[in-house]
């Protein structure tokens, strides 16, 4: 179910846009619950639309693995302030030691944290999205034009598409 907020877009278009934004922005704040408070940290997302999942490489020594094991509902906050594009995703996370998936996700950036994909401390956190909310700007030029038009007409500008997506 989608609340389109007068975007003129279908649920399918909005879902596709949420996936596209997450894939484009790539780095998100991965937010867990430790039983007392939320904990956030930046992680690189690996989007797998076919599997309807978002994967993250993580280290077994981190606290987030324990938090995910106890409280699997997590939030992912993707933010591109320069282009005014944002997507927040909530879903269920699970930790895996799937060595084949780790090798598939391995890239040169991971080398900053581990020597190789064979490092026994690497784990995968897979998040299956349950719902999302996106805010999407048409871009700086269009936003500037909308603000100028608003200044001339006295009407509030519509600068961002906003939509809540349930059961994505």
Q: Predicted segment positions?
A:
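C-terminal edge-of-domain segments
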Residues: 2-8, 120-168
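A short, sequence-level motif marking secondary-structure junctions
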Residues: 46-47, 92-95, 139-141
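Extreme N-terminal tail/first-helix region
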Residues: 1-29, 152, 161
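Short, structured beta-strand-loop surface elements
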Residues: 5, 64-131
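A short, compositionally biased
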Residues: 22-26, 71-72, 128-129, 158-160
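Short beta-strand segments
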Residues: 26-61, 66-68, 74-80, 86-90
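Short beta-strand-initiation
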Residues: 25, 40-42, 119-122, 160
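Charged, amphipathic alpha-helical segments
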Residues: 12-15, 61-62, 108-110
């Amino acid at each position: 179910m989608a609340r389109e907020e007068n975007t003129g877009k279908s649920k399918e278009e909005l879902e596709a846009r949420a996936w596209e934004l997450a894939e484009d922005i790539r780095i998100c704040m991965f937010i867990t619950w430790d039983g007392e408070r939320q904990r956030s940290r930046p992680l690189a997302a690996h989007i797998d639309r076919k599997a309807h999942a978002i994967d993250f490489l993580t280290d077994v020594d981190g606290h987030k693995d324990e938090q995910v094991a106890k409280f699997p509902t997590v939030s992912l906050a993707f933010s591109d302030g320069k282009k005014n594009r944002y997507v927040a995703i909530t879903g269920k996370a699970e930790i895996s030691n799937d060595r084949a998936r780790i090798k598939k996700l391995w890239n040169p950036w991971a080398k900053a944290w581990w020597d190789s994909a064979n490092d026994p401390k690497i784990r995968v956190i897979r998040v299956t999205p349950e719902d999302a909310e996106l805010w999407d700007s048409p871009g700086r030029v269009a936003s500037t034009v909308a603000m100028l038009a608003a200044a001339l007409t006295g009407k509030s500008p519509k600068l961002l598409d906003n939509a809540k997506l349930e059961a994505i």
